[in-house]
Amino acid sequence: MKPKILVIGSTGKLGVKLLNFCYSKKINIFGITGFKNNILLNTQSKKYNIKNFFKLNDPTQNKKFKLFLKKNLIDIIYFLDYGYNSLIYADIFLNHNRNSQIAIANKEMIIAGGDTLVNKIELTKNKIIPLDSEHFSLMNTVLPIENLNKVYITASGGPFYFKKKCKS
């Protein structure tokens, strides 16, 4: 049986690359989401024959996507967007899916979700797959939190790409 794959953030740089890769390997995608680039989302749904696609900036579509998460068992979910807004989707997903793979390329989600996210993933017998070395490092930090004074996280892309550099 083919795995059901869901991509949150298919219109971003990583999402575009993942869809192209899957297409080249004849891997079917079960569902995709986008936020701002609705034209690309529509193009992707047609080009890759993806019937389940959701424009998350549209309140009606957002509601439908949440229902979609509740009603469908997903084998692999990719969080390729940025920001912590996808925590709500992760929570819905985790309430309805077991033994799935959760691939995260979204460090804001890991930081904002913290132990709560990681513990819920473990409790629901899902498996987290950090997709970047930063995320892997964050997930495997075992220092006692009370000994931490500061944490520096570099911002090389995503929402920080066009921000002015700050001197500290």
Spans of features found by a protein language model:
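General beta-strand structural signal in soluble alpha/beta enzymes
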Residues: 7, 55, 76-80, 103-105, ...
